[in-house]
Amino acid sequence: MQNPFVFFVKSFVCVALLLFTSNLIAQKTKYKIDATLDSEERLIFVKQKIIFTNPDTEKLNVLFLQDWINAYKNTQTPLAKRFAEDFSRSFYSSAKSKLGFTVLDTVHSPSNPLVWKRLEDQPDIIKITLPEYLAPGATTTLTLNYTIKIPDSKFTRMGINDSGKVYLNHWNIVVAPFRKGKWQLQSNLNLEDYSGPASDYELSWHYPNKYHLTSNLIETKNNEVDSLKHTHFSDVDRIQADFVFDTSNRFLTIPLDNGKVVVTDLLPPSSGSVDLKATIERVVKYADTLFTPFPNQKILILKSSYDKNPFYGLSQLQTEVRISKNKTLNLKFFSDTFFYEIKLLKAYFGRYINQTLAIDKREEHWVIGGLHTYAMIKYIETFYPDQKFLGKLAEFKILNLTLLKKYSVAKLGFNDAYEFIYEFVENSNIHQADKQSKDKLSKFNEKIAGPNHVGVGLRYIEAYQNNDWLPSKLKEYLNFKGKLDFETLLRTEDEDLDWFFDLYLKERKSFDLKIKEFQKTTDSIRFKVVSRDRSE
């Protein structure tokens, strides 16, 4: 029989280790920032403190910081090379005054200036050498003084435009992600894949009084002195801090029944045919039911985010064409409510998933995209099960003839479009494996075909299980904010999903099959399936 004292000691050690590990995981980086905007010179002057706690079980003597604004400094950065790969020439032909960069003046620990340098091939990554090792769970404070030259917004929609409007995201220097004992040194590639953990912010802005300032952070104080506005923000558990400076206040604030607040400039037509609050309430409530509630009190939904990654093909089916000075041709094939709801749904779920999951979004982008598409499929199944992909286009008459009605595409359900699009990509032989790193994918596969393929695959799993197993697993995954490995969570002894992870996502093989010699008898059906290489 085991000695009770030994048993007690072992139990105590196990509990202590568990609590210690949990404490390490729970520690968050805190940012205290004082920033002054000079919009005329396109500059931001920043004084910043980073309160960093070692999340590892080993001691550290090196820290890495991400300075993604510095990715805009010249044509030799990884971001510039990404622009070239995407055949975007505006960055290369722009004047130097349109580019962006960071001048880092000083970096201090509480007692000493620190040695730092930028990585040679990644000028948006900063390496800092600490004067002494930082023990597991120990905290240190870095003090930084730097100046940001804001890039022109024409490159990525982030930055400043010619009218002086400023949109900032991933703009301040932050600690690079640290996972599984390794630093993730990822440069800015304009992929919307910042992978840092949720952090706490205390931030004060000083800016010209011509501006209205909107943020996803909670505003706590606001005053004006000598033509300058001073606004203080404080918030916790934020993966990023977004700010919009605009001379016109284009945002609406909508309090929700659950106590949260939505702030958005993604608005419906001015005709008044859309009940904005009711539409937002329905989308938010559905997300809360399908997954888990949004992790923060304030929800910022940006039109610029939707414009950067819109619902593919939707706008082309909802427009008006001017055919003369006083006459327009109405090519609106969806109701204003449905059209706005889909745009809101796309933008909200994108914001929701990105702000909830603190995962490696460059390598695990397929999780983000798949959940996004899956959520939209489920929403349409719930509220618009009979909606067609082409809307009323199939009924559109030219010379009194409905030319599309007899074609199969006119019968496609709205959700059929996801499969239709990725099958088109496969038939064109331009598809790529979903599990490839995001920076290896073409833009079409990254934004459209890949997420569609993964989302439809998740819906296949749910239909095959015919129960609430998958929805409950997805809730569990989102409830833990990505701390559980998605693949490990779904791979269980009772569920054989090798086909999904190893074949459907990783290999992504396509097959060109043909059914021939079809025979039907009273009690059976016989046919042959022939592939492109004629094997049967």
Say what each PLM segment does:
Residues 436-522:
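Amphipathic alpha-helical substructures
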Residues 363, 369-456:
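Acidic/His/Gly-enriched intrinsically disordered linker/tail segments
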Residues 214, 299, 497-500, 511-513, ...:
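Beta-strand-rich binding/interaction modules
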Residues 44-71, 75-76, 85-89:
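Ligand-binding face of N-terminal immunoglobulin V-set domains in extracellular IgSF glycoproteins
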Residues 1-29, 310:
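Bacterial Sec-dependent N-terminal signal peptides
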Residues 86-105, 118-120, 124, 145-244:
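Extended, low-hydrophobicity, Ser/Thr/Pro/Gly-biased non-transmembrane segments
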Residues 203, 253-365, 371-375:
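Juxtacatalytic substrate-recognition/specificity segment
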